[in-house]
Amino acid sequence: MPIHNLNHVNMFLQVIASGSISSAARILRKSHTAVSSAVSNLEIDLCVELVRRDGYKVEPTEQALRLIPYMRSLLNYQQLIGDIAFNLNKGPRNLRVLLDTAIPPSFCDTVSSVLLDDFNMVSLIRTSPADSLATIKQDNAEIDIAITIDEELKISRFNQCVLGYTKAFVVAHPQHPLCNASLHSIASLANYRQISLGSRSGQHSNLLRPVSDKVLFVENFDDMLRLVEAGVGWGIAPHYFVEERLRNGTLAVLSELYEPGGIDTKVYCYYNTALESERSFLRFLESARQRLRELGRQRFDDAPAWQPSIVETAQRRSGPKALAYRQRAAPE
């Protein structure tokens, strides 16, 4: 009675745990038909009836209850054998990791050190957020992990998860007309020239598509901020690029009224599906999430050293929203 596909065992156990095929399909992100067929095929392999169907509900048979502990052990052995095989073959494997330039350098150092605990070689590749996803889709890129602020729901060969958040700011030269405008949201900036990251492919995801119709594209954040400091337009940049300039007064924050403390930006991890079953990779994900949380707390503690107060920010603006901020922030 050979079991032809261990994925069928995993799906069957999920059906029993959730109580229905529909629930298991949602959890596993599979179609109802795929999960139902997996259970049926497993019954054929084992020559026993495993479930009783009662409408939408599914209950295990007595034979299934006796087999379930062995099935769980089988999956545990599969994981163990996979880990052993991975370690035997690890050798000089070169894990290629792409990190876009919106990710803080201190986080990149953490990524490298954590991965080197389990992989002999790690190559870190830095690229613009506007090009990150296009890069991992190239067949010759051979990227294993990509950490980026850009988002795409489905990419062949890759799974996606969220590691945490980083901060970004909308900035302009202190003498830019926007510094005296009433800004209710980022949409208020649409009529002014934006300095934005350009994609080599000429296409942008919805997340990174420019807000303004008047756009000047550049290749990197350094070029963006040089033009912003020259008064050419406004831009959106990661916190670690702009905080020194904010302290020096060469840039002003435009997003403080509607996003105090910076704009929360999700950090996504796209990883080759082959890594999903490796415990070392799961440990890396947890370490990466923890490091992002630590960086966020550290920024919060350091923020008062440079961040303007609500009163100071509001006094640089005009209009009803600025007046409301002044009234709320005024001392008793």
From Swiss-Prot:
Q: Which GO terms describe its biological process?
A: regulation of DNA-templated transcription; regulation of transmembrane transport
Q: Where in the cell is it found?
A: Cell inner membrane; Secreted
Instruction: Offer one Pfam family short name for this entry.
Output: HTH_1
Instruction: State the UniProt keywords alphabetically.
Output: Cell inner membrane, Cell membrane, DNA-binding, Membrane, Secreted, Transcription, Transcription regulation, Virulence
Extract the InterPro entries matched here: LTTR, LysR_subst-bd, Tscrpt_reg_HTH_LysR, WH-like_DNA-bd_sf, WH_DNA-bd_sf
| Domain HTH lysR-type: from-to ranges | 4-61
Report if keyword Translocase is assigned.
Answer: no
**Does the keyword field hold Membrane?**
yes
Any single Gene Ontology cellular-component annotation:
plasma membrane
The UniProt entry, under PROSITE patterns, shows: HTH_LYSR
Annotated DNA-binding residue span(s) = 21-40
A molecular function annotated in GO for this UniProt entry is: DNA binding
Modes of activity regulation? Both 3,4-dihydroxy-2-heptylquinoline (PQS) and its precursor 4-hydroxy-2-heptylquinoline (HHQ) function as ligands and promote MvfR DNA-binding activity leading to transcriptional activation.
Q: What does this protein do?
A: Transcription regulator that plays a critical role in virulence by positively regulating the expression of multiple quorum sensing (QS)-regulated virulence factors, genes involved in protein secretion, translation, response to oxidative stress and the phnAB operon. At the stationary phase, negatively autoregulates its function through cleavage and translocation to the extracellular space.
Q: Which family does it belong to?
A: Belongs to the LysR transcriptional regulatory family.
Subunit architecture = Forms homooligomers.
This chain belongs to the protein called Multiple virulence factor regulator MvfR
Give the species: Pseudomonas aeruginosa (strain ATCC 15692 / DSM 22644 / CIP 104116 / JCM 14847 / LMG 12228 / 1C / PRS 101 / PAO1)
